[in-house]
């Protein structure tokens, strides 16, 4: 089993939202790299990073923080949050981020997701949230008509392994 400690970024800070509510945010630190070093010192080899600003409004306001995390090395880094275009995927992969995570776009544009899975293979993962067994998107604000299990089968058929 591989454990991925997580860093959620908002405005360049390490934060956690309460039940996904941007109005109920706790700041845990000003320096994401310092947090990552603490994870490494505790034995971590992997890191899950979520760009909450990107997820909410599609901006790249945390790009410098993510670049700094990738530059310090020592961790396998996966990034999610607001990745909706191939340009964004390329931008993150060019930083030596190891994997990009697609979220809501996997549901809203499955053809795009299938193309990215084919083009980038294991460098693409898909995050699937489910509520009452059905796929939830856009920060749990919408629930699709598709069951999570069925959606995951379609993803596997499209080549998704993570």
Where are these regions (language model features)?
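Catalytic domains of carbohydrate-active enzymes, especially glycoside hydrolases
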Residues: 35-50, 95, 157-162
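Active-site-proximal loop/turn and secondary-structure-junction residues that shape catalytic pockets
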Residues: 9-11, 51-54, 83-85, 106, ...
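Conserved anion-binding
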Residues: 19-23, 90-93, 97-162
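Short, acidic/polar
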Residues: 28-40, 84-90, 143-155
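Hydrophobic faces of well-ordered beta-strands that scaffold small-molecule active sites
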Residues: 3-9, 47-49, 75-81, 100-102, ...
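N-terminal amphipathic alpha-helix/helix-capping segment at the start of soluble metabolic enzymes
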Residues: 1-19, 131
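Glycine-rich, proline-tolerant flexible connector loops at the mouths of alpha/beta enzymes
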Residues: 46-64, 104
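Alpha-helix-loop-beta-strand connector modules within alpha/beta enzyme cores
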Residues: 57-80, 113-129
């Amino acid at each position: 089993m591989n454990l991925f400690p997580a860093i959620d970024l908002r405005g360049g800070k390490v934060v956690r939202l309460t039940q996904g509510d941007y109005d109920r945010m706790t700041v845990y630190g000003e320096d994401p790299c310092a947090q990552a070093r603490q994870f490494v010192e505790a034995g971590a080899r992997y890191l899950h990073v979520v760009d909450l600003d990107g997820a909410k409004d599609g901006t790249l306001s945390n790009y410098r923080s993510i670049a700094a995390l990738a530059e310090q090395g020592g961790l396998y880094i996966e990034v999610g949050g607001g990745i909706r275009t191939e340009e964004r995927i390329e931008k993150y992969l060019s930083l030596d981020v190891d994997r990009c995570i697609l979220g809501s776009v996997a549901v809203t544009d499955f053809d795009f997701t299938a193309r990215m899975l084919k083009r980038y293979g294991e460098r693409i993962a898909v995050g699937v949230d489910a509520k009452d067994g059905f796929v939830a998107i856009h920060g749990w604000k919408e629930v699709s008509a598709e069951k999570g299990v069925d959606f995951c089968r379609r993803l596997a058929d499209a080549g998704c392994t993570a």
